[in-house]
A protein has these predicted regions:
Chain C
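A structural signal for multi-pass alpha-helical bundles of membrane permease subunits
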Residues: 39-53, 85, 134-147, 217-223, ...
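Membrane-interfacial helix termini and adjacent extracytoplasmic/periplasmic loops
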Residues: 12-16, 58-61, 67, 116, ...
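Interhelical loop and adjacent transmembrane-helix boundary motif
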Residues: 4-7, 16-23, 55, 66-78, ...
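Transmembrane-helix boundary motif in ABC transporter permease subunits
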Residues: 7-9, 13-19, 91-123, 136, ...
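Hydrophobic alpha-helical transmembrane segments of multipass integral membrane proteins
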Residues: 35, 39, 84, 88-100, ...
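C-terminal transmembrane helix and the adjacent membrane-cytosol boundary/short C-terminal tail
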Residues: 2-13, 24-25, 115, 175-186, ...
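Transmembrane alpha-helices
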Residues: 28-29, 37-41, 163-164, 170-175, ...
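N-terminal signal-anchor/first transmembrane alpha helix
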Residues: 2-47
Length: 383, 303, 283
């Protein structure tokens, strides 16, 4: 390790212990504790300003935590400099060195570590991202997608213990983004490194990651496998940030076997006990739009239902989205798959019934903050 | 004058990340700063202080060329009463030269930024290249071009467009020389600001206003204002202090304050205090004008 | 105002003629202005072939054009000595100003410290001060103050003065380059195991280098062509511009035209050559 006496070898899970980062006027990361198992693809998901990028920068060593510890395995990395950590970053704007060729960009890290075969390693990394033919070019001569791959190769070539991706696909157009998502996932499976992916795009996080952590106001709201989190959000924020939800504030008034009975703005709805993080008092009732059916007549034997008036119909190809005003004045959203040759012909102003299986409903603690989210729907359900 | 130079720092950071600049130890900053700052202190600030004290000195009676420390405000009074017209000419000629330079520079800068395409670099070089032929040589060449028997004067005389019959040794020659000599200082900042301007905004302006002139007045010109501001200062300041053009192209009736300062220092025995007072007054006037100008057109980019 | 009308980008049919004119107007005006810039240079060139008698102001049809001044550019007494002096001063002043100014620029862009605003003002004000005031103040200090420490007007006082006014221009040029650098490049380097000194020499410095080279070229041309400040602080030393100015009354020798035009030609060739090379390297 020529010229790099301070470099710390470390292997194992990445652990953040009670990490806090405060700036002059606000706390970006607030007492965060987290374990990322070795070899997993982990996504930090959240809106801008939630502290996810600051968390990433602290892992990289570009920021130092105000308090708390950052470890890989049993090695404490807190306080060490970025060049001393077995961690590499794919920057949001790629930050490729404009004065170096693609090959020299990729060989930069191995050269700094004094590896004799730096150029050979660089060429192998370029093979991995399928760009060996562009090795002699300068970054300015590459397209956005190609630059992105070079940035990935430049980080990967070092075989870091943890690879950090800071919104790496943000600058790409939709089609290229989808393609790169698949590509990154393939590379991660191939090399088996720990990937930490910061993004505000919930679809991207869910497509790629084994584990997703949703951050808000410097804290983790919920963490888990994407499917589980989508199916059963535990906070109103997650219910709206990960997918959309029809939500309504109410209170729990009764139980019915393994179900809770809640009164939501004058209507009675049921929530499975296992699907509610509150079991008494104030609750936020929720159901996902694609779980809600739209019917002309009041249906029987499905579950709970509510009457409403269609306000908007938008055809999106695989499905049709209905926006329905329920009696409380709130707007519910529902998706119907376009299975029939002639779909139900509904127009704004038509009266309909919305219905769902009560097993699909969920309950989360009430949260004023959720009202700020765009798709929150304050609703009252009528039996 | 970083309008010449101002380039938006590549701020593409996510809003979550605060300034990526780590707070570095200021000791290193002072080490970097020290040599240059000391140089500027010793060879700029201290000389100015000295100039100010000289401007208040008095002559030893009977010993021409010898002075004693004093607070002789009369030097400033003399500077104004005896050489008021020279101050007036300096400001007037410099103002005219700045205006003409703007009129000539803008089309050139505009063509460089928007019409030149791959010739941009070449044009840039061409604007700077004349600098390498000595400024004095070029000014002497203007004297030849504008001479009574030269092409410009003879043409104008044939057309009866030249009232006095000649250009050299008139204010016209001096203003022409000043305009010429400082033109590149006007072109480059305007070009820099036009080049930096977002061309799409100008296109949008072209869509909104059918009239090309309206687009120019409401969109293009305001966007190039930082460059125009820097350019006018970079032209006006050296022009107001110049004496070479007045010396080589003008006559006794077109002498500017620079000529007076130069001759008081080098050709008038005991002229030091007056010359210093004149210099200091000139600097004060120009700094005041710069200050008012920058205030009026408002830019913090200048520093 | 003789400013150009920009093209209306999607002109309605009726406006197209006006747009066409506006389009050409800028180009035509630009070519005319460039011609204006070069006209005196052309005169300097032509009169370098003049077989003049007493003063090289009027064209002498007898024996002109002649190559004799080009064959013997040092033929006039003092002309080549003044050129050498100017070149020496230019090189020394440029080197010193580039070092001092680059350090200053790094301090101002990359660091937060007390007195930063004051430092910015200290760098800016010399550029906003007329040369004659700079020259006058230096003259008073050299004659009345620094002469006590053994500094006499001459070669070194010119060098010191030139360093002073070049520093500000170096700072402005290098600062612009530094500010345009993405700070994330430094972070990326550190992330890729580069120590702070590695980061500086492998990333920051190569990226700032074009700005430093530009600053050096600017400094050299400012120093080489300076007359006003030089005339105040030069004493008996003669630089090339001072040589031309002083010999104006007696008659400027055509050798000065030869040298003046050659400097122009050399600079033009160097710059064009340089841009061709850097253009090829980019491709």
């Amino acid at each position: 390790m020529a010229g790099n006496a301070g470099f710390r070898e470390a292997k194992g899970d990445l652990r953040l212990e009670n990490v806090t980062k405060s700036f002059a006027d606000f706390t970006a990361v607030d007492d965060l504790s987290l374990v990322v198992p070795r070899g997993s693809f982990f996504a930090l998901l959240g809106p801008s300003g939630c502290g996810k990028t600051t968390t990433l920068r602290m892992v990289a060593g570009l920021e130092q935590p105000t308090s708390g510890r950052i470890l890989i395995g049993d090695t404490d990395l807190t306080g060490s400099r970025p060049y001393e950590r077995p961690v590499n970053t794919v920057f949001q704007s790629y930050a490729l060195f404009p004065h170096l060729t693609v090959r020299d960009n990729v060989a930069f890290g191995p050269k700094r570590r004094g590896l004799k075969n730096a150029v050979q390693l660089a060429d192998e990394a370029l093979d991995l991202v399928q760009l060996p033919h562009l090795a002699a070019r300068k970054p300015a001569q590459l397209s956005g997608g190609q630059q992105q791959r070079v940035a990935v190769a430049r980080a990967l070539v070092n075989r870091p213990e943890v690879l950090l991706l800071d919104e790496p696909l943000g600058a790409l157009d939709l089609k290229l983004r989808r393609q790169m998502q698949v590509e990154l996932k393939r590379i991660q499976t191939e090399v088996g490194l720990t990937f930490i992916h910061v993004t505000h795009d919930q679809e991207e996080a869910m497509t790629m990651a084994d584990t997703v952590a949703v951050m808000n106001h410097g804290r983790i709201e919920q963490m888990g496998a994407p499917e589980a989190m989508y199916d059963l959000p535990t906070t109103a924020f997650v219910a709206n940030f990960v997918g959309q939800s029809n939500l309504g504030a109410g209170r729990i008034i009764d139980t019915d076997g393994d179900r809770l009975v809640a009164e939501v703005q004058g209507s009675r709805v049921k929530i499975p006990k296992a699907r509610s993080s509150v079991h008494s008092g104030e609750v936020m009732f929720g159901v996902r739009p694609e779980k809600v059916r739209v019917r002309r007549e009041q249906p029987e034997g499905i579950g709970d239902d509510v009457k409403g008036v269609v306000r908007d119909v938008s055809f999106i190809g695989v499905a049709t989205q209905y926006l329905v005003e329920v009696p409380s004045g709130a707007i519910w959203s529902a998706y119907e798959q376009n299975l029939d040759v002639e779909p139900i012909d509904l127009r704004p102003g038509d009266e309909v019934w919305l219905t769902w299986q009560s097993g699909h409903a969920f309950g989360v603690p009430p949260d004023d903050d959720a009202a700020a989210s765009p798709m929150v729907i304050d609703t009252a359900a009528e039996d | 004058m970083s309008t010449l130079a101002h380039v938006g720092a590549g701020a593409s950071g996510a809003p979550t990340s605060p300034s990526p600049e780590p707070a570095k130890k200021s000791r290193l900053a002072y080490l970097l700063l020290l040599p240059g700052a000391v140089w500027l202190l010793v060879f700029f600030v201290i000389p100015l202080v000295q100039l100010f004290t000289v401007s208040l000195q008095s002559q030893f009676p009977g010993y021409p060329g010898y002075y004693y420390r004093d607070v002789n405000v009369g030097n400033y009074w003399r500077a104004f009463t005896d050489f008021g017209p020279h101050f007036g000419r300096s400001l007037l000629f410099a103002g005219l030269a700045t205006f003409f330079a703007f009129c000539l520079a803008y089309p050139l800068a505009y063509a460089m930024a928007f019409k030149a395409g791959k010739w941009r670099g070449v044009m840039m070089i061409l604007v700077i290249a004349p600098f390498f032929t000595s400024f004095i040589l070029r000014t002497v060449a203007w004297r030849q071009i504008l001479a009574d028997e030269g092409p410009v004067a003879t043409t104008l005389n044939t057309l009866h467009l030249l009232p006095g019959g000649r250009i050299t040794e008139t204010w016209m020659a001096v203003v022409a020389g000043l305009t010429y000599n400082f033109l590149p200082f006007m072109v480059l900042p305007i070009y820099a600001s036009l080049e930096r301007a977002d061309h799409r905004i100008i296109e949008a302006g072209g869509d909104l206003y059918a009239n090309g002139f309206t687009t120019f007045r409401t969109v293009t010109l305001p966007m190039s204002m930082p460059g125009v501001l820097a350019g006018t200062l970079l032209t006006f300041i050296p022009a107001a202090g110049d004496y070479v053009n007045a010396e080589l192209l003008g006559s006794d009736n077109t002498k500017m304050v620079g000529n007076v300062i130069e001759s008081q220092f080098f050709r008038v025995l005991g002229g030091f205090p007056t010359a210093a007072a004149l210099s200091f007054t000139l600097m004060a006037i120009i700094l005041a004008l710069v200050f008012v100008y920058v205030r009026k057109f408002g830019t913090e980019e200048l520093l | 105002m003789s400013a150009p009308n920009p093209t209306a980008y999607r002109p309605s049919a009726g406006k197209r003629a006006g747009a066409w004119l506006a389009n050409r107007f800028a180009i035509i005006a630009a070519v005319l202005v460039l011609f204006y810039l070069f006209l005196p240079v052309l005169y300097v060139f032509i009169f370098s072939f003049n077989n003049y008698r007493k003063s090289n102001i009027a064209w002498n049809p007898n024996g002109s054009p002649t190559l004799k001044h080009w064959m013997d550019p040092c033929g006039a007494p003092g002309v080549c000595e003044s050129l050498v002096t100017s070149l020496q001063i230019g090189v020394i002043a440029t080197l010193a100003a580039v070092v001092l100014g680059t350090l200053l620029a790094f301090a101002l862009v990359r660091h937060q410290f007390r007195g930063r605003t004051a430092s910015n003002v200290l760098v800016f004000v010399p550029m906003a001060t007329p040369e004659i005031v700079l020259g006058a103040s230096l003259l008073t200090i050299f004659v009345q103050g620094f002469s006590n420490v053994g500094l006499r007007l001459g070669f070194w006082t010119i060098v010191f003065a030139h360093i002073m006014f070049c520093i500000s221009f170096v700072v402005v040029t290098v600062k612009a380059r530094l500010q345009s650098l993405d700070p994330r490049l430094d972070e990326a380097a550190m992330d890729l195991y580069a120590t702070p000194s590695n980061t500086f020499w492998k990333v920051t410095f190569p990226l700032v280098l074009p700005g430093i080279i530009g600053a050096a070229m600017l400094s050299f041309s400012l120093s080489f062509d300076d007359f006003i400040i030089t005339s105040f602080v030069s004493g008996n030393e003669t630089t090339f511009p001072k040589f031309v100015y002083v010999s104006y009354l007696r008659g400027i020798p055509a050798q000065a035209n030869v040298i003046g035009f050659s400097m122009f030609a050399i600079a033009l060739l160097l710059v064009i050559g340089g841009s061709i090379i850097s253009g090829r390297r980019k491709a």
